[in-house]
Regions:
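N-terminal Rossmann NAD(P)H-binding glycine-rich loop of SDR-like oxidoreductase domains
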Residues: 1-9
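Residues in the short beta-alpha loop(s) of Rossmann-like NAD(P)-binding domains
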Residues: 17, 87, 206
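NAD(P)H-binding glycine-rich loop region in Rossmannoid oxidoreductase-like domains
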Residues: 20-23, 27-77, 90
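Conserved Rossmann-fold NAD(P)-dependent oxidoreductase catalytic core, especially the SDR/UDP-sugar
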Residues: 68-116, 124-128, 134
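Conserved SDR Rossmann-fold cofactor-binding beta-strand/turn motif
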Residues: 137-138
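Glycine-rich Rossmann NAD(P)(H)-binding loop
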Residues: 143, 167-172, 200-207, 218, ...
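Substrate-positioning beta->alpha
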Residues: 148-154, 167-190, 197-198, 212, ...
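Mid/C-terminal beta-alpha module of Rossmann-like enzyme folds, strongest
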Residues: 188-250, 282-284, 291-293, 297-312
Length: 312
């Protein structure tokens, strides 16, 4: 939103709260998007150049019916509907093109299933009713103000001179996108005429192993990393989980790999992301200004690491 305001756009946020802390230049609409009648009431008589649908309810999920409901309501009121999907919409697999099949309706993981179903619903609205839909599929997003304990997880431990847990053999692939590059490509998705009706993979062109990721975090902080490889089955057996409470590799960070190819976004949207190292350098500056100085409970990691450290 800050970027849209900076570019001179009139910006409105629609959410459940009666107010916000985004500044006086951002107007406020209060509604629960799950309540169609509320949406109808607050959107009545209003038109927008573009809608950015970025919200996902991690507690209850955001089903395709909710996304489709908003799309139907604004179909004749907007010239662009930009939906934030995810690399997870593919379900699994490596080196995906945009034309690859998305996760089916019976996919077991809710987030991936709902993102895939939402994309299918929006493109049906585009085909049948002319909704000017564009979808974006980013991988792991990193950068300042990340609400997930990810980059900070590693930097906290590196600064405390902790040994890091490396799940498995360290070769699991991860792919990233700096948040400022995501913002820039969202603006492009709003303005480029040829984007309508298309999905775009957006991320750094090269995937990285988890070993390389740890090395990059250490380099950004100017620290040396010490790691111990621990089999995933042992991590899970003693209570570790990617979503916590017993984290071992950041929040929701150690996941089966899904990677994508970004040639289409480069060609159509002029997508030019910064390197992972460049983005981490800026993110670390933010971290130094904002990180919490409270003590961290390392007892679970100590439990994981103890056998390996005793054997070494």
């Amino acid at each position: 939103m800050a970027q849209l305001v900076k570019l001179g756009h009139e910006v409105t946020i629609l959410h459940r709260r009666a107010d916000h802390d985004l500044g006086k230049k951002v107007a406020n609409l209060q509604a629960d998007r799950n309540n169609v009648e509320q949406l109808k009431r607050v959107l009545a008589g209003k038109t927008f150049d573009a809608v950015f649908d970025n919200a996902y309810d991690w507690e209850h999920g955001t089903p395709a019916s909710v996304v489709e409901g908003l799309g139907r309501l604004v179909c004749d009121q907007v010239s662009r509907y930009v939906f934030m999907s995810s690399v997870a919409a593919y379900g699994d697999g490596l080196n995906h093109h945009e034309g690859d099949a998305l996760a089916p309706d019976d996919w077991p993981e809710r987030y991936a299933r709902q993102k895939a179903q939402s994309e299918r619903a929006l493109f049906k609205l585009h085909q049948r009713y002319g909704l000017q839909a564009v979808t974006l599929r980013p991988p792991f997003i990193y950068g300042p103000d990340n609400p997930f304990y990810r980059e900070q997880f590693f930097w906290d431990r590196l600064r405390d001179k902790r040994v890091l847990v490396l799940p498995g053999d360290g070769r699991r692939l991860m792919q990233f996108l700096y948040v400022k590059d995501l913002v820039n490509v969202m603006v492009k998705a709003m303005t480029v005429p040829g984007a309508v009706g298309h999905a775009f993979n957006v991320g750094n062109p090269r995937a990285m192993t988890q070993t390389e990721v740890i090395d990059a975090f250490a380099a950004a902080a100017g620290k040396e990393s010490k790691v111990v490889r621990i089999p995933r089955d042992r991590i899970l057996r003693v209570g570790g989980h990617p979503m916590g409470p017993h984290l071992y590799f950041g929040m929701y960070f150690d996941l089966p790999p899904i990677t994508l190819l970004v040639n289409k976004a480069q060609r159509v949207l002029g997508f030019k992301p910064c390197t992972f190292d460049e983005g981490l350098k800026e993110t670390y500056k933010w971290y130094l200004r904002h990180h919490s100085k409270t003590s961290i409970d390392y007892s679970f990691e100590d439990q994981l690491l103890a056998p390996a450290l005793m054997a070494s």
